[in-house]
A protein has these predicted regions:
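Mid-to-C-terminal Rossmann-like scaffold of FAD/NAD(P)H-dependent oxidoreductases
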Residues: 1-103, 138, 142-168
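A short, polar/charged loop-to-alpha-helix boundary motif
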Residues: 103-120
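Catalytic P-loop NTP-binding/switch module of NTPases
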Residues: 119-128
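Short hydrophobic beta-strand that contains or immediately precedes a catalytic carboxylate
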Residues: 176-180
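Short glycine-rich anion-binding loops that position phosphate/pyrophosphate groups of nucleotides
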Residues: 182-184
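Short loop/helix-cap segments at secondary-structure boundaries that form the rim of catalytic
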Residues: 186-193
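Short hydrophobic/aromatic-enriched beta-strand-loop microsegments
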Residues: 194-199
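Conserved small/polar residues in nucleotide/adenosyl-binding loops
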Residues: 200-206
Length: 206
């Protein structure tokens, strides 16, 4: 019952049909569901399977979320995009990705769609040699950044927690639960057991 954008598959199948009519031997390999849509000023794109579909198929999957700039931060006009990359635990097989943002979304989803089609692992995203100039990207492209994050997970350098994990976090004092939003945001609503330490008061070690 998956909804697909059909223009691309239909045109490919038309060529395959014509090839076979003319004594060729072409086959359709299927679609991985790449699509993109414009919603007012924003762009939303997807490729492969999402987390829900992967779990329904019995795949033990993991994911990373990141919100990098569309191009180098010091170059004017950059805007934040948010990526979600889904991969299989253990094998790091790349399963799918979704992106929402304003510019550069289609470029990154096409890179990820190509990586899935080529059978690259999620760990190989960090090694992709992608075009860079400040108006168009960053020296560490958002796709590379996703690969760096997944590599950190594979080495056990970080442990991720997601909003759906909040209720399962211990409230016995064994861990410190921090809400790093501003005091006003904290006052508007917060999860039980979290203490407020605004990110504006945090200093990272140098």
């Amino acid at each position: 019952d998956t909804l697909l954008s059909l223009a691309g598959p239909a045109n490919k199948q038309g060529r395959i049909a014509a090839d076979n009519i003319c004594s060729g031997d072409s086959r359709y390999p299927g679609s991985q569901g790449s699509s993109v849509i414009k919603v007012f000023d924003m762009t939303i794109a997807t490729t492969g399977v999402n987390e829900k579909t992967a779990k329904q198929a019995g795949i033990d999957c993991d994911k990373v979320h990141l919100s990098p700039m569309s191009h180098a931060g010091y170059y004017p006009g950059g805007k934040v995009m948010t990526l979600k990359v889904v991969f299989e635990k253990g094998t790091y097989r790349l399963l799918g990705a979704q992106i929402v943002g304003y510019e550069g979304v289609d470029k990154r989803i096409d890179v990820l769609a190509t990586a899935i089609h080529a059978g690259l692992s999620a760990l190989q995203l960090k090694d992709l040699d992608l075009a860079y100039a400040p108006p168009y990207s960053s020296a560490k492209d958002p796709v590379n950044m996703a690969g760096f994050m997944i590599e950190n997970l594979s080495h056990g350098l970080v442990e991720q927690f997601f909003p759906e994990d909040v209720d399962a976090l211990p409230r016995d004092g064994s861990v410190t639960l921090l809400d790093v939003r501003t005091p006003g945001e904290y006052a508007d609503g917060h999860a039980e057991g979290f203490v407020t330490v605004s990110y504006t008061h945090l200093t990272l070690p140098t």
